[in-house]
Amino acid sequence: MLGEKIKNLPEILPMSGASVKVPTFSWLKITGLDTVLGPEMKSTGEAMGHGPNFGTAYLKAMKGGNKKIPTKGTVFLSISNEFKVEIVDLANRLKKLGFKLIATKGTASHLRASEIDSEVIWRISDKKSPDILSIMREGNVNLIVNLPTGKRAATDGAQMRRLAVELGIPFITTITGAKAAIQSLEEGENDYLMPINKL
């Protein structure tokens, strides 16, 4: 197909730009299903994007899957201890992009120790106000990054993720997804178009 034998090809083939493929989900059609990803198949399709760099390709793929990463507004962070070291860098990058950060008490405390400001929002199970559900219903959060562990976190997270689906608020449940989304905001070109004959 390439006009050469495999043994004669270079180890790294010359490439132009980057391509990203993302799964698509029909969460709204599956009532009551927790939207956190696991080993079972929940994807109902996929979308692909191509661009001059990873960020642009990722943005295009997300658009193709009818998902939009916000470019401004408020990001809610609820991060398990396992990812608290990595989230410091990501939170700093979100701040530099102009986002306001709100977070659960534990996550906010960890960010504060690294001199990153965030507003504390109560966990749902704390039964105090304001909690994340009320903030979401008021339209005051644009993106949710929820990396949970533990039974209470899973229960809180399930309610929050379900409401996010119903309200159309983008949410991320993996550290890899969070890194990809932030990189796409840093280097992605939203209006980038490539002629199909250049692919």
Predicted feature descriptions by range:
Residues M1-I172, A178-A181, G188-L199:
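ATP-dependent carboxylate/acyl-activation modules
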